[in-house]
């Protein structure tokens, strides 16, 4: 999910 929608998957990306 992070690869496409980081903002929606937080906290998923650094």
Swiss-Prot record:
GO-annotated molecular function: toxin activity
SS bond partners: 1-13, 2-9, 6-12
Compartments where found: Secreted
Tissue expression from the record: Expressed by the venom duct.
GO CC, alphabetical: extracellular region
TM ranges: none
Keywords of the record: Disulfide bond, Neurotoxin, Secreted, Toxin
PTMs per UniProt: Contains 3 disulfide bonds.
Superkingdom of this protein's organism: Eukaryota
Domain commentary: The cysteine framework is III (CC-C-C-CC).
Similarity section: Belongs to the conotoxin M superfamily.
Function: May act as a neurotoxin.
Protein name, as recorded: Conotoxin Fi3c
Source organism: Conus figulinus
């Amino acid at each position: 999910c992070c690869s496409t929608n980081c903002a929606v998957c937080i906290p998923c990306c650094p």
